Amino acid sequence: VRNAFPGFVSPITPEDLAGLACEEAALARVVLHDRKRDRWELRNGPFAEESFPKLPKKDWTLLVQDVDKWDADVAALLEHFAFIPSWRIDDVMVSYAERGGTVGAHVDQYDVFLIQGMGRRRWQIDANPRAPKAFRDDVELRLLREFTPSHDWILEPGDMLYLPPGIAHYGVAED
């Protein structure tokens, strides 16, 4: 949905998200991708502040779950989804990615509303319900072995993409 949130400004800065990822109780991870060798690395938090400047200039993503439980402005985003029964809402996960950052092609077993906060991200989905769902066995993440996109969009701040459970998707930070 283009411009689903007109004039959207991310309620949390990358610096604040990184700070949250340093908290002992926060559920945080960094995913790094070596595109040349197609190697993936998963690092779990909590992180030390000095670990962020040591990350590469591109090809990584920071993800923090349950951000709505830490930040009232992030929690306020849930008001836009009051039409969904509360038992179907888990949390607000926030990601920050440098150019080329991705978590790989994967499938979630729950409704996902992707709201683009800062920068632009390319999203591809495979809308075929019979698409292969086998996972790679060479990585710690549950990444799809095969992914053939049927749709492709670049989301900008305020844009939203809805993904029903079981829809394969792949997002890569453009900037």
Show where each model-derived region lies.
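Short amphipathic alpha-helical segment that frequently serves as the phosphate-/nucleotide-binding helix
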Residues: P14
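Conserved beta-strand-loop-short alpha-helix elements that form
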Residues: Y162
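Active-site region of the double-stranded beta-helix
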Residues: G7-S10, A18-D159, I167-D175
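Short hydrophobic motif
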Residues: V1-R2
